[in-house]
Amino acid sequence: MKPTRFYQHRRVLVIGLAKSGAAAARLLAELGAKVVVNDQKPLSENMEAKQLEPLGIRVVCGGHPLELLDEPFDLVVKNPGIPYTNPMVKKALEKGLPVVTEVELAYHISEGSFIGITGSNGKTTTTTLIYEMLKADGQDPLLAGNIGLVACEVAREAKPGQWLVTELSSFQLAGIDKFRPAIAVLLNIFDAHLDYHGTKEAYAAAKANIFRNQTERDYAVVNADDPLVMNIASSVRSQKVLFSATKLLGEGAYVQDGAIYWNGDPVIRIADIVLPGQHNLENILAAVAAAKLAGASDEAIRQVLATFSGVKHRLQYVAEIDGRRFYNDSKATNILATQKALSAFAGEPVILLAGGLDRGNEFDDLLPYLQQVKAVVLFGQTADKIGRIAQKAGIETIRYVDNVEKAVPVAFELSEPGDVILLSPACASWDQYKTFEERGDIFINAVHKLK
């Protein structure tokens, strides 16, 4: 861990615990800050808060009292999940206090260099691919960020010359100040998290923050097929490196003659890549570009792409039961992700399980993709909305159930041998489940109960 006196004796308020907030509080205390943590959950139910008290950290739980900010703080660190509309956060900003996320702390203490990956879809797959490619190359990369590994915890272990391959959400990037990845990857931008950011413009601006502090020595890996991404890329100071699944670029990562090319040279035939789906081709191209910039060999990249079959909850093959194939795509928390999942099974009979948190989206963009679906089983707050679009798409078999667990046997009853039964909700999970991982695990367990 890089020695720093920046936080010594500073008064820091950490708003929101969970994994990232608790990790930030522990780190700040270790760096000599005077830390106060504030969390909505009552202390009696708050194991994370109880574990912080013996470290000399003051704990204020059971709500977000605005008067807490009448005390003199130098800095606020907020859990990424807490929106900027939260009254505590708004008051902190009104008082002129810097408000950051733990990714900023990770950057301050890391002796290694960051590869940051963001986008509306494909972040986890791309992050994992880059990490695996560097590992296969004999490097010693670290995996961090929104992938479930708190960045400021991982950054403590980073050594000079070591890469931190870090998945970054818009929530995290909205709260950075000095954070500067040596390689920044922007995959795509679509309507997502509008309940959090308010507008698509604010959401895109948060994503664009990944490039904000880069210099001419750094790299911006950007999707040449996404107009909004390219618009953002037009103003970056770093060296632009393009990837494209549709354009013959000549430089960067692209497809030509059935193979992936890097700067004019073939790397791997697409036929030799295990990971399914056209959307994953974009993720692979981005990963190839980032891995090559980080020094990976073609052989290491080929080795990974010839064996890597995907990440859990992302078009994950679960089982085949009585001729029906089950896929878990619980990570499909927005409409585009479900469009891509359905595209991956074009021409096959699909029974779709969908629904979840209502963020105000309409689902008309699903209509052309639903026309290939033979039946839908719907749950959650958006069930009626998606059901109306399914009717417009001409789907005759529409079922409504309470939750994912009940959806699985209903889908099985509706299915025939040769069918694909696909969980791809097109919505976040938080109306019924804590995380998309929990939702996916419940789906997997329900599938195995059919055996």
Curated annotation (Swiss-Prot):
Pathway: Cell wall biogenesis; peptidoglycan biosynthesis
Biological process annotations from GO: cell division; cell wall organization; peptidoglycan biosynthetic process; regulation of cell shape
Binding of ATP, residues: G119, S120, N121, G122, K123, T124, T125
InterPro entries for this protein: Mur-like_cat_sf, Mur_ligase_C, Mur_ligase_C_dom_sf, Mur_ligase_cen, MurD
Reactions performed catalytically: UDP-N-acetyl-alpha-D-muramoyl-L-alanine + D-glutamate + ATP = UDP-N-acetyl-alpha-D-muramoyl-L-alanyl-D-glutamate + ADP + phosphate + H(+)
One cellular-component annotation, GO: cytoplasm
Main localisation: cytoplasm
Keywords: ATP-binding, Cell cycle, Cell division, Cell shape, Cell wall biogenesis/degradation, Cytoplasm, Ligase, Nucleotide-binding, Peptidoglycan synthesis
Localization, UniProt: Cytoplasm
Family: Belongs to the MurCDEF family.
NCBIfam families tied to this protein: murD
Name this protein carries in UniProt: UDP-N-acetylmuramoylalanine--D-glutamate ligase
Annotated source species: Geobacillus kaustophilus (strain HTA426)
Gene name, Swiss-Prot/TrEMBL: murD
